[in-house]
Amino acid sequence: MNEKKELKLILVAARNHLSRGDLKLLLSYLESDDCEFEISLQISEPTEQPELLELHRLVAIPALIKVSPAPKQIFAGSNIFVQLQTWLPRWKQEGVTKDLGINLQPSKIDSIRTQKEFLLEEELLVLRQENETLTKRIESQERLLRMVAHELRTPLTAATLAIQSQKLGQIDIKKLQDVIKRRLEEIELLSQDLLEVGTTKWEALFNPQKIDLGNISAEAILELEKFWRLRKIEIDTDIPSDLPSVYADQRRMRQVFLNLIENALKFSENSGRIKITLIHKTNQWVEITICDKGAGIPVSEQKRIFLDRVRLPQTSEGTSGFGIGLSVCRRIVEVHGGRIWVVSEVGEGSCFHFTVPVWQGQNKDQQHLTKG
């Protein structure tokens, strides 16, 4: 009976990896009589032995390292057991030829090729990880650019409407100057955001503080007054006098109100009605609801409309879909720890709901909010 050759292995894996199917099969096989090697296996937790990552130049875990016999080999990925099974017969054959004293040149060539293949695989893994990191960074920057570009429309539209109102004699020159001054200040802040897009994270563009949502909703309604008055649309509000302050970024909350009210106006009939409700839902949250009596949204589309780059097809009388506004709203609400959703039925209209955290003396020096 042939004596089993020793095979020294190190499995670098976190505890949760060990419950994975392929690693369970691997460990079971190495402990069984079917394995034709005398196995010496060391299982290492990377957090307890981080030096192993550097020593063996590991770029991904779990990883199985063949320490001896030389040359060293490393297997990583989701099919470690399959990779090992491919190599076991080869290692056994190499052991037999060494016992017979046969020096096979092809074996040396294979060994060199194997090492080169391993180095190439390592480089490919590093490149994949770098590519993934860069892709995520580019996507994040694109989202920031879309948000800021979308937000630029508001002060520009307001300034244009103010100029038109002054020409029609609806406001005096002093009021026009005041509106233009405030809108230019908003554009200046947005230009600062644009300059920071390449160097900052999404959350860093938020400045949460104690604010009054009732005032913000009133400002948004007033800003869109020309649109709803022209179409004779009524806007009803239900805002309790004892509504608590919330902890949020004032500019971003204003943007959410403007986007949702604009959508409600867009999908409302002339002489229609929009209802805005603010409720102190729990000790932790204020819930805002904006309802219209428009065309409604199919159930199949109610989650998709909050995704990036999703626009519903034309709905009625030339009205285009929701576009970027709702994905921006979702990201703003989620950065504040809240959530946003829609309740809608085709032909019956839509109600958009979102939640904002109640002010509870949060640390004003807090740099960003936690995404919920």
Swiss-Prot record:
Member of the two-component regulatory system SasA/RpaA involved in genome-wide circadian gene expression. One of several clock output pathways. Participates in the Kai clock protein complex, the main circadian regulator in cyanobacteria, via its interaction with KaiC. KaiC enhances the autophosphorylation activity of SasA, which then transfers its phosphate group to RpaA to activate it. In addition to its output function, recruits fold-shifted KaiB (KaiB(fs)) to KaiC to cooperatively form the KaiB(6):KaiC(6) complex (independent of SasA kinase activity). The lineage of its organism: Bacteria, Bacillati, Cyanobacteriota, Cyanophyceae, Synechococcales. This is Adaptive-response sensory-kinase SasA. The modification Phosphohistidine is found at H150. The N-terminus interacts with KaiC, while the C-terminal histidine kinase domain autophosphorylates and is probably responsible for self-oligomerization. The N-terminal domain stimulates the C-terminus to autophosphorylate. PANTHER family: HYBRID SIGNAL TRANSDUCTION HISTIDINE KINASE C, TWO-COMPONENT HISTIDINE KINASE. It is an enzyme of class 2 (transferase). It holds the Pfam family KaiB.
